[in-house]
Amino acid sequence: MDSVIRFSVSLPSQLLDELDRKVSEQGYASRSEFTRDLIREKIVNDSWKDADEELIGVLTLIYVHHHNDLVNKKMDIEHDSDVKIICTNHVHVDHHNCLETISIRGEASKIERFADRIAGLKGVKFSKLTKAAVPKF
């Protein structure tokens, strides 16, 4: 691990109070650890702007599995896509609804296109792409 460098940040008192509340609520050991996580999150989000870099993501879906041919259309998109599907997890929420997570690796633009195609299928009630990347620091 690199050496740690201390620096200071000036904040309005209300923002500092909110920071301390978040640090406490979320169980962080310190303001520094909370701030490091925020910086990492910003760097990961910005890395998604570089469409050529290989990244990872998780697509979370809730859909009605009885809907006309939805499962087959979803599988066709998965098999025909140019992203790597690492893992899927399927949960039967109730008699009609399924929760599915799809872990994906590929270029940012291809992952987003894949997620958009599946989200646009009739019968998909909820779709959220969680963007991730392994920080290089």
Curated annotation (Swiss-Prot):
GO MF term list: DNA binding; DNA-binding transcription factor activity; nickel cation binding
Where does the source fall among the domains of life? Bacteria
Q: Tell me the residue numbers annotated for binding Ni(2+).
A: H79, H90, H92, C98
Q: What does the UniProt keyword field contain?
A: DNA-binding, Metal-binding, Nickel, Transcription, Transcription regulation
Required cofactor(s): Ni(2+)
Q: What detail does the entry give on cofactor binding? A: Binds 1 nickel ion per subunit.
The alphabetized list of GO BP terms reads:
response to nickel cation
- What Pfam families has UniProt attached to this entry? NikR_C, RHH_1
Q: Which family is this protein grouped under?
A: Belongs to the transcriptional regulatory CopG/NikR family.
**Record-linked NCBIfam families:** PRK00630.1 (NF001884), PRK01002.1 (NF002169), PRK02967.1 (NF002815), PRK04460.1 (NF003381)
Main function:
Transcriptional regulator.
Query: What is the recorded name of this protein?
Result: Putative nickel-responsive regulator
Q: Which organism is it from?
A: Campylobacter concisus (strain 13826)
